[in-house]
Curated annotation (Swiss-Prot):
Functional note: Found at the monomer-monomer interface of the photosystem II (PS II) dimer, plays a role in assembly and dimerization of PSII. PSII is a light-driven water plastoquinone oxidoreductase, using light energy to abstract electrons from H(2)O, generating a proton gradient subsequently used for ATP formation.
Keyword Repressor: no
Pfam family, one: PsbT
Gene coding for it: psbT
Family to which this protein belongs: Belongs to the PsbT family.
Protein name per UniProt: Photosystem II reaction center protein T
Keyword tRNA processing tagged: no
Amino acid sequence: MESVAYILVLTMALAVLFFAIAFREPPRIEK
């Protein structure tokens, strides 16, 4: 079950990175 924990940590890291970029730059999500 260590792969599940690894995937969870990786997802959390990606979410933190995404939110950091999204809140640092002006919102350009919609196309």
